[in-house]
Amino acid sequence: MSHNAPLVLMILDGWGYNENDRYNAIAKANTPQWDEWWQTCPHILLKASGLPVGLPDEQMGNSEVGHMHIGAGRVIQQDFTRINEAINNGKFAKNAVFHEVIDQLKKTEKSLHIMGLLSPGGVHSHEQHLFALLALCNQKKFRSVHLHLFLDGRDTPPQSALDSLKCLNEELAKHPVATINSICGRYYAMDRDKRWERVEPVYNLLTQGKSERQFPDAETAIHFYYKNKISDEFVPPTLIGKEHSIQDGDAVLFFNFRADRARQLTSTFLDPLFKGFERKTLPKLSCFVSMTQYDKNLFTTTAFPPVPLNNTLGEVLSSHGLSQLRIAETEKYAHVTFFFNGGCESVFTNEERIMVPSPQVATYDLQPEMSAHELTKTLIAAINSRDYHVIICNYANADMVGHTGNFEATVQAIECLDQCMQQVWQALKNNGGKLLITADHGNAEEMFSEATNQAHTAHTSEPVPFLYVGGGWHFTHSEGSLIDIAPSLLALLGITPPPEMTGRILLEKNHAHA
């Protein structure tokens, strides 16, 4: 099916723009290809955080939200904002799912196990959502509640769990309904790469109370781990206080609102064909509540079900008979597929997908190039095949290596990406193709926080670049936001964006001078 010059949309995950060169791994890196484009090709900056991407004002962007908005071409109220609003307008406290679960447990005299990421990060969860659940349990005079808390240190400073625990203890003083029964770093509880050896000890802790160490309270445990140079993200599964594991008839409530890092742990309880590891015990739960839908094949009771989206970029390309390829390494595969399609599981007609396995290393600063070279080879083969009108690809390095806080490794990651971009453009040029480059949010352009005097491992609220390589077109605006990408890409293809896409077309064809 050899037809056309492909258009590639390249998403450089975590590649933000920062005027300040200090602690900026992108500015520090040697990037001859990027520098040449920045001097000679049309480019502007796009907003990728806060209100323009459906998040609360000044909330940093993230990969899920970024890809959703790039694909949707309109502002989508994010689950985070939706849940915040429900708390503020009283709908959260009236949510029928929560009431039914608690009423059932009161009747059977069983326990509710609330688990999730205790964090003010707002990327996968927010601790205020947990506090609202505790207030609801208190309102309903239900006190058989056990907390299994995952620690962040990735979307927050590496050692910040004690601040969150202080806030939690203040809430528990007001609403004395629950005890903290386990803690665990997100590295273990929220893996998304089928590294079941990380998830298994979490499952054993939750279902059998098994743990290498036990502490009387969470603070003592965290002080012990900090003393041993273990930061929040890497705290091993640890029993706190008296053992209260999940028993038959109990209910579980997982309060994370973002799906990708909640799926695996959820599947250990709910997947009848689960093969990740041998489960010594499988509690017969009365209910498993997830804050949002994690996967349509995991039958959780969902407190905030998804709002369907029509006419995302993938659907529009498909309805115009165009072929498209989505390609990424494991870490970001869900982002260029599920999230890019508006949180929709289905694959459109003429949409193909390739996943390049991410390397099996403990943390990506140990291999800053990740699988970028393999991804580039596969991408170049796809360009040369001329089988696809549009290719949407994601390079994970700036984000995943940026999250480690290792500056030198992140510089290496950026330099590797520059070489990859150069090779991809060579192939596109040979095939008469065009290239759009952008990012979903910032990260690598700010690697150290003077405010906390710690590595800055989280995302940023900086704008992201939007760069066009291929000649013949120019930008008509000096800035935009992520929702303008899909309409602009459709304009390059000569397609009128559908009315659902409220983003603007930022690109215009150059006029030939008479």
Curated annotation (Swiss-Prot):
Q: Name one GO molecular function term.
A: phosphoglycerate mutase activity
Binding residues annotated for substrate, in chain numbering: H124, R154, D155, R186, R192, R258, A259, D260, R261, K332
| Assigned EC number | 5.4.2.12
Quote the record's binding site residues for Mn(2+) 2: D13, S63, D440, H441
Sites binding Mn(2+) 1 sit at D399, H403, H459
Looking up CDD domains in the UniProt record yields: iPGM (cd16010)
Residue ranges annotated as transmembrane are none
A biological process from GO: glycolytic process
Q: Give the matching Gene3D superfamilies.
A: Alkaline Phosphatase, subunit A, BPG-independent phosphoglycerate mutase, domain B
Query: Any binding details for the cofactor?
Result: Binds 2 manganese ions per subunit.
Can you state the subunit structure given in the record?
Monomer.
What the protein does? Answer: Catalyzes the interconversion of 2-phosphoglycerate and 3-phosphoglycerate.
Q: Which PANTHER family match?
A: 2,3-BISPHOSPHOGLYCERATE-INDEPENDENT PHOSPHOGLYCERATE MUTASE (PTHR31637:SF0)
What this protein is called in its record is: 2,3-bisphosphoglycerate-independent phosphoglycerate mutase
This chain's source organism reads: Legionella pneumophila (strain Paris)
